[in-house]
Amino acid sequence: TYSDASGASENSTRWGVDKPLYKDLIGRTKAALKKNPKNVLFAVVWMQGEFDFGGTPVNHAAQFGALVDKFRADLADMAGQCVGGSAGGVPWICGDTTYFWKQKNESTYQTVYGSYKNKTE
């Protein structure tokens, strides 16, 4: 669950457009930018965990792309505080937090994590 006062709850394990973790991400980002007009968003660091291991990896790239697009659209009104003066120009740096996937199911790992590699949009 999500509330403006406390952010995403501890049991919020799902990410995606308009999910509790997304609302927390956009809410905290906007709060940080509003706190000081001199604050600038230089990048978003996305750490891919293992929760998606049991999901539908073929849908991951499209769902992640939709999340990034929504984030950038939701920050459009704060473009002046984004690197390069555009929310669309804020890079997403993607990493992973576990090698469990790679050891247990290389193809699932490559489907999900591999979709981040060499993306420039």
What positions do the PLM features span?
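Cell-envelope and extracellular/periplasmic
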Residues: T1-E121
